[in-house]
Amino acid sequence: MADLSLPPDSLFLGFDSSTQSMKATVLDSNLNIIKTELVHFDSDLPQYKTKDGVYRDTTVNGRIVSPTLMWVEAFDLILQKLSNANFDFAKVIAVSGSGQQHGSVYWSKGSSEVLRSLDSKRSLKEQLENAFSVKESPIWMDSSTTLQCKEIENAVGGAMELSKITGSRAYERFTGPQIRKLFMTQGEVYKSTERISLVSSFMASLLVGDYACIDETDAAGMNLMDIEKRCWSKAALEATATGLEEKLGKLAPAYATAGSISQYFVQRFGFEKNCVVVQWSGDNPNSLAGLTLSTPGDLAISLGTSDTVFGITKELQPSLEGHVLPNPVDPESYMVMLVYKNASLTREEIRDRCAEGSWDVFNKYLQQTQPLNNGKLGFYYTENEILPPLPVGSHRYILENFSGESLEGVKEQEVGEFDPPSEVRALIEGQFLSKRAHTERFGMPSPPLRIIATGGASANENILSLISAIFGCDVYTVQRPDSASLGAALRAAHGWLCNKKGSFVPISNLYEGKLETTSLNCKLKVKAGDANIASTYGLLMKKRMEIENKLVEKLGHF
C-alpha cells in the first residue's frame, strides 16, 4: 500500500461552481479539511444583478440563465481570497471541481487561442470578456425546451429508447435539448460556436488553459452520450444538431487527468507547474464521492437549491423518470439520481409567508403538528417542477376518513388554504413523501439501509427527523454540508493517485480503515423510528401518488 499513499504535506484543492455560489475546499494528505472559501454570486458580485445566482426571463416562459462571465469573475475572486489569506498554492499537487449539472457554455471561434495565451498580470474576466458566443448560459432550472425534448425523443424512436441509449429520457434542462434550441432558433450563433462545454469542463478549461474534455459522468446529463459504450451517440447527436460532435470534443473518465495546470496560475498564484488538474464533474457525482457512498442500499439526499436523491447500482436499468450516470469513482457501477427543482427556495418561500421569515418559528410548527398532519396533503411549486412534471402552483387537500390503517373509503377534498403550522408540515411531509414514492418506483431499496443527508437543510434536525420517520431508516449527516466541493477535493486526490499508478485505483484505498479520522466521516443523527409510522406514511404516500397522477394528467407541462 505504500505506493498508494498521498505525499505528506501535500494539499488537494476542490471547487464547486454551483447555482448560487462558488466554494473551495482544501484537504491535506490525511483527508482533513484545512481551508474553505466562498464567493456568493448575489452579494459578492452584485454588478451582475442576479437573484439566487440566476436571471429569470419574464419574456420567455421557463427560460432561466446565468451570465457566463460571472462564473469567470467568481473564479478570479475565490483564488484572490485564498491568496489574500496567505494560502500556499505551491503545496497543491492536484485540483478538481464540481459544476452544476447540465448548464452549458458556448465558446466563440478563436477562444482556445485566448485560453492558451492568458497574461498572468491580468484577470481572467478581463481576458475572456469576448470569448463566448452566448453570453448567458442556460442552466438546470431552465424549462424552455419542451418542444426540443419531444423532437429529440421522436427522432430516436421515443422516450424509452432515448433513456436506453443515454440513461435518461429528454428533460428540458438537459444540455442536448438546450443545444437543439440554439441550433433551431439562432443558427448563426450556433455556427459561430467553436466549442460547447458543460459548467464542469468549462471550469477545467480555465485551469488547463485549453479546452478540457467533458467527463463521462457529467456527459450522461446531456441526452447525448451512449451510456453503455461511454462515447457520443450518433443517433442522439443527429437528433440534436448538425456538426455537433466536433463542437463537443472528446470524452474522458471522471478520474482521468485533464492536464497540468496552466502557466497563468503558476505565475499569478504560485501553483507548482506539475500540479495536475483532474477532470471536473457534476455537483451530484461529486457529492456522491464526498459522502463516500459506495454501498448499494445506501441513499443520499442532497438538500440545496435543488433536492437530489441518489444511490448506487451495478445494473443499468433505463426508466422514464430519474437518471442513470456512470459512477465517477468506480467504472464498474452506476449512480442513479432523482432531481427536484422545488427545494430550498420553496422551503424559504413558505418560511417567509407562514413562519414570520424565521427558521425557529418554522421548526416550532413542525414540532407542534402531528405526524401525517391530520390527513392534510400539499403540493408546492414555486418553479415548474421536474418530478412530477407540474407547472408553478399550489394544491392542498384534506383526506376524509383517513384512519392510517387503510385507504378504503378515503377521499380527498381540495381546499384553498391551511393554517400556517399545517402548511409548514404539509410542505416538508409532501416533499419527502414524494421522494420516497419516486425512489421506490425507480427500484431503489425500501427502506434504505440508511440515508446520508447533505446540503444546507441537512443542518435542520426537525427536517432530518421527518426524513427518518417517512423512509423508516437511520439518517446520517456529514460534518460539513458542502459535500460537492469536499468530493471534488477528494476526487483530486483520487485522480492524482490514478495518474501516479497509471491505471484506475479504487477510491476506498484513500480512506480504508481511517474514515473516522478524516473530514469524510458520517455521523448518525436520527435513529430509525417506529416502523408502524413509516408504514402509515407508506399509505399516505400511495394516496399522494394517486393525487399527483391526476394532477399530471390535468396539468402536466411535458
Swiss-Prot record:
GO biological process per UniProt: carotenoid biosynthetic process; D-xylose metabolic process; xylulose metabolic process
This protein's record includes keyword Transferase: yes
Record keywords: ATP-binding, Cytoplasm, Kinase, Nucleotide-binding, Transferase
Family annotation (InterPro entries): ATPase_NBD, Carb_kinase_FGGY, D-XK_euk, FGGY_C, FGGY_N
Record-listed substrate binding positions: 16, 20-23, 111, 283
Stretches of the chain forming a coiled coil according to its record: none
Catalytic activity: D-xylulose + ATP = D-xylulose 5-phosphate + ADP + H(+)
Compartments, as annotated in UniProt: Cytoplasm
ATP-binding recorded as keyword: yes
Pathway info: Isoprenoid biosynthesis; carotenoid biosynthesis
Cellular component GO terms held in the UniProt record: cytosol; plastid
Activity regulation annotation text: Repressed by oxo-clomazone (keto-clomazone), a bleaching herbicide.
Gene inactivation effect: Impaired xylulose kinase activity in cytoplasm. Hypersensitivity to D-xylulose (Xyl) leading to reduced seeds germination. Loss of remediation of photosynthetic pigments after oxo-clomazone-mediated bleaching, thus leading to albino plants.
Residues where ATP binds: 305, 456-460
Thermal dependence of catalysis: Optimum temperature is 40 degrees Celsius (at pH 8). Active from 10 to 50 degrees Celsius.
Known cofactor(s): a divalent metal cation
GO molecular function, one term: ATP binding
Family: Belongs to the FGGY kinase family.
PANTHER family: SUGAR KINASE, XYLULOSE KINASE
Record's function text: Mediates 1-deoxy-D-xylulose (DX) phosphorylation in the cytoplasm prior to the translocation of 1-deoxy-D-xylulose 5-phosphate into plastids. Can also phosphorylate D-xylulose (Xyl). Uses preferentially ATP as cosubstrate.
Name the UniProt record assigns to this protein: Xylulose kinase 2
Taxonomic source organism: Arabidopsis thaliana (Mouse-ear cress)
